[in-house]
Amino acid sequence: MRAAWCFLFWLRCCWPRWEPACAAAPQGTLRGLRLSWSYPTAAGGLSSGGPEVLDTLFADAAAYAQAHGLNALFLDVADAELSSIAFRDRAYETWPGTAADDSLFYKYDPLRALCEQASQAGLAVYAVTPELSGNADWEAALARMQKKYAVAGLYVEGSALFDSISRQAVFYADEAAFNDPSSLFLASLDTDGFHGAVFDYARCRAQPEAFSVLASALDGSAARPALLEYTPGGTLAVSYPADGAAVYTSACFVMGTSDPAQELLLNGTPVESRGPGGTFGVLVDVAEGSNVYTLTQGGTSVSVTVNRPAPAGGGSGGTTEVPHDDTAEVEPGTPVRIRNWIASLLYDPASDGNISETVRQGAVATVAACTETLRGGKRTWAYQLASGDFVLAYNAEPLPPETPRASFTGAAAAATDTGEVLTFAGSGTPLAYTNMVDGALVMDFYDADFAADFAVSGSALVQSAAVDPGDGCTRVTLTFTQPVWGHTVEYADGTTQVILKKQPVRSDVFGKPLTGVAVLLDAGHGDHDPGAMGAAGTGAPAEKDVNLALTLAAKYRLEQLGATVQTIRTDDSFLSLEERNRAIVAGQPDFFIAVHHNSIDLSVDANLQTGTECYYFYPAGKALAQALVRNVTQATSRPDRGAQWGYYYVTRSTVCPAVLLEAGFMVNPSEYENVTSEPQLWAAGDAIARSVLECVPPG
């Protein structure tokens, strides 16, 4: 018996023991993976696992962390009740989580096992423990632990996950964060308070796509842009209307700035509608003649005078001839060519909103009849085409009567970076109506002849081409071998081309799910065109400034997610609507978003106008418009005004989903402070990026 005890004593003293290596914290931003007791081992957690199962779990977790660019493993070394312990310390008498697997010569130690796996993978290890007592001596606890284990630190879980020594908190991506991946991005914007992120391993395995989006927020390779340097001022001032202004309505919305800490009076009556920063707006009655409005705050007063002229007297009763512009009537059968970059084909020439089709510069059609209509206070001609729709005469130029009909024998395909270009063999640039029907491209060409055996050669996208001659037009239907995302009929040098765009797909590159996706962002207005005036007036951000700030925020977040982002402007410059629309065709993006902020006539109460809306023209843009409204309103708490059809110039492209976002109202005082707030700009920018991600089909 004595010999046995001596042997055991010798074994304990002399048997080689694993010594902890120097435990160093990882360089750069902390990116950790946490193993917790909240899940069974099969799901990536610690509970219900014996030594062999836990060893496998630790090896898998280390490999997973290494593969996903993480630099640390976090292990829950005790559950909340101390009923399960994952390390050995003489302060605790039992280790219920591992005791069943102990033997005389072997004591399984989960923390040591994890440290060994982490060391091989080049990962740091941190222990996580419940906050058992506010007076706990964490320095002593960590020092005692580091005598036996290669741990870089001890983190304590209370209301947050924080370092036991420095008390610096890290972002813990738990179930709530995985269900709202924007949370980590917004937390990372706190330059001083953000020290890294730790991801729940079980959640990573269960929700890999959300993990990818969450992790993208840790990409700091690009410099974060400066947005708006604006704080609502406390100076009493009126931004609208100007002193001495003439107003022709019975009401006027008076806007300006004030000190939010002091009461504001307008002609002795308290002004209730103010933003947190003191920006105010109030609807006032305007009587005929001179109206004086005096704003008072503390010992300061500001007055503006508004004049409302009396209505002009009645006329002589005679008729006034409406002038005619310089367009001309043409004979039926005259060919005409579209002269502008895009033009509307109208059901009714009296209304610009009755659009049947948008056609591009160079399209040729035949006039069936002419009719007069009004535009801009002048009479003008409208040409009714063979299709039955009308084009306004100033959008078209007459051609010689002997202009030949278009004629085509086939088409040849050439691959591009984004799809293919089909060049028609033959001559002519006929007017075409296009539509996507059940994944096929249906094109109706007017005044054009097609060979019965018309086919597309050399295409990897086009599966078949069917020609169906009809009454006045020929229908060409293209089916495809894979989904086509967009198309454009282009005319150049007397030839007709169809540009086909391949469908983008979500990438499986970790942290970069938008790799390969191209987005074109258009910050509305610019330079001499300020857009809507803000409620704070001159010297404060105008719409053009807020549009650019939100565009830059969205660009930054989209690029974090892997997208290739182009912007129409990156400074205070101006581009025409045509230049903006041309950029869509030239760039062939997968998504186009025009970023704007709203306004309204200032004869109504702008305090009642609030929220986000988004416009699309073609059906392909509807889903993107809906996603933008949903996500921006959720991120900013602005009201949802819906996705709506509209014929804005920049949205009239079939290249890709194209929308115009009105993110919020510039003339609503409270919402003005909201849309110019940097945290809200980042939240809305992230919402734009998430909307794009939602609309990209899975790979």
Describe each model-derived feature in a short phrase:
Residues 587, 594, 598-601, 613-616, ...:
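Active-site-adjacent mobile loop/cap segments within catalytic or ligand-binding domains
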Residues 38-42, 79-83, 131-134, 159-162, ...:
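Solvent-exposed loop/turn segments at secondary-structure junctions
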Residues 85-96, 131, 500-583, 587-589, ...:
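Active-site histidine-acidic residue metal-binding/catalytic motifs
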Residues 25-231:
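Glycan-processing catalytic domains of CAZymes
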Residues 240, 247-249, 260-261, 272-297, ...:
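Short linear recognition/processing motifs and adjacent strand/loop elements at protein termini
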Residues 17-26:
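Sec-dependent signal peptide cleavage junction
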Residues 32-34, 72-76, 126-128, 152-156, ...:
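Structural recognition of the beta-strand scaffold that forms the well-ordered cores
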Residues 223-247:
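Short, compositionally biased P/S/T/A/G/V-rich stretches that sit at domain boundaries
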